[in-house]
Amino acid sequence: MSEEMDNVTAEEITDKHLQKDLDAEENQNVVKTMRGKVREKLKISKINKGEKSSMEQLVESKIYQRSKLSPQTEVSLDESLSFFILSGEEGSALGKSSEQRPVKDSYPKCFSLGVNLQNVAESEDEEFMKEFILTDLLKVKAADYEDDQEQIKKQKANIFVPSSSPVVNQHKLPKDMMPRILEDEGFYIQRKPEIYKKTCNKMENRLLKLEEGKCWFGESGEIMSLPTPIKQSWNFRLNVRKEPLNPLLKTIYRKL
């Protein structure tokens, strides 16, 4: 028997080790696949960046060539209107001022176009990261919502709220047993502290939910808050003598 138990334990240990190895291999495979997806998408984004950068260079070169070839042909709207509106002397003065204007004024336009294209490319890269890469790495799930009725059902299943309705004596006492009225039988009963009836009913309902809850009820069907007069409880030192007690010394309780 001991050898069989040892074999069983050894097989269980080997099975546990095999399961751990399989779980580790599955986790590694998942990590590898995720890394491969991210690398592929980064490659695609780099290729798109290269195409965008080549297009930007072509646009900038074309703008620079146009500004270099025809620097004198650039005519503003103000100059074209002044040719028809102003007189000869004023037009000649404007022409001189336009000739004195340097050709380098066209370069800021090209620079601003390049900056705008770069900003557009960066914004597109951020959108690409949000749409494709982050959706694979993160799981988006709707927020959990429960109705009020479902929450109340769960609370009722976990929390017990006792009712304030009175309990029938049959539930408090054993089967086929009637409650005893000890005062009518001549027993002395101490005065109990005043308690609201609703709180007492709640306590009785709570005790009856327990497995040994009936032990808290006496033969009268009430909660045992005071020592019962049926069972003798000695508050003094007992007489250990073998001689019998004098019957005249015994106390006899009688109801007046």
Swiss-Prot record:
Q: Say yes or no: keyword Coiled coil present.
A: yes
Identify the species of origin.
Answer: Macaca fascicularis (Crab-eating macaque)
Superkingdom of origin: Eukaryota
Can you cite an annotated GO cellular component?
ciliary transition zone
The ranges of region (Disordered) come to 1-24
One Pfam family in the UniProt entry: DUF5523
* PANTHER family reported in the protein's UniProt record: CENTROSOMAL PROTEIN-RELATED, PROTEIN CC2D2B
Biological process annotations from GO: non-motile cilium assembly; protein localization to ciliary transition zone
Coiled-coil residue spans: 136-159, 194-214
Q: What name goes with this protein?
A: Protein CC2D2B homolog
Q: Record's InterPro entries?
A: DUF5523 (IPR041510), Tectonic-like_complex_comp (IPR052434)
